[in-house]
């Protein structure tokens, strides 16, 4: 077919039946110029190279990122109860259009960090009631900045049952 591409993966040795191959010490080249690859080291480590440089290194001890990693900031929908997802919106912001309740973030993973910026609208002086799933220092939820168009930033760590506050900027 016109414009069709043919991909060839060359693996030494016989290939038959299910594709179960030992790639120990092998490098799988993922692009035409050979600078993007997966390499299965012999020391329980997998290197992912992009542009000829290590991008990520996975090992039994840890995962190493050679470049910055981030979650794009999601904009939450303002509503009487503000909903958000720890799995798809771990970094979020919302602009308050009235006094609101912040619902518990859905689908969290134990040990996960999440962050939210709560912004006052042009009127200001909006309040937020936090769901009981959020736990603050001294067991007291903070009072938000009342200034119009200003915001407060909160960071939480999920412990399996509660979102424990680990930082704030008011």
For each feature predicted by the language model, list its residue ranges.
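Terminal beta-strand-rich extracellular "head" domains
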Residues: 133-147
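Exposed extracellular interaction/assembly regions and N-terminal maturation sites
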Residues: 64-135, 150-170
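Tight coil/turn sites that cap or link beta-strands
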Residues: 2-3, 149-151
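Beta-strand-rich receptor-binding modules of extracellular spikes/adhesins
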Residues: 19-67
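Residue-level "contact hotspot" at macromolecular interaction interfaces
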Residues: 1-2, 107, 145
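Surface-exposed interaction regions enriched in Ser/Thr/Asp/Glu
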Residues: 1-19
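Residue-level detector of short, conserved catalytic/binding motifs and their immediate flanks
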Residues: 4, 36, 46, 112, ...
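Secondary-structure transition/turn motif
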Residues: 1-2, 50-53, 167-170
């Amino acid at each position: 077919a016109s414009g069709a591409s043919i991909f060839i993966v060359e693996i030494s040795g016989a290939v038959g039946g299910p594709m179960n191959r030992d790639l120990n010490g092998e490098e799988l080249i993922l692009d035409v110029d050979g600078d993007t690859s997966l390499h299965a080291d012999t020391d329980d480590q997998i290197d992912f190279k992009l542009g000829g440089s290590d991008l990520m290194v996975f090992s039994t001890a840890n995962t190493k990122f050679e470049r910055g990693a981030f979650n794009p900031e999601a904009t939450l929908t303002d509503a009487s109860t503000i909903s958000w997802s720890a799995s798809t919106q771990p970094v979020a912001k919302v602009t308050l259009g009235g006094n609101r309740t912040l619902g518990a973030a859905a689908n969290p993973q134990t040990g996960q960090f999440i962050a939210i910026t709560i912004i006052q609208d042009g009127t200001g002086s909006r309040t937020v009631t936090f769901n009981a799933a959020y736990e603050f220092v001294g067991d007291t939820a903070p009072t938000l900045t009342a200034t119009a168009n200003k915001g407060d930033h909160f960071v939480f760590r999920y412990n399996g049952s509660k979102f424990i506050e680990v930082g704030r900027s008011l």
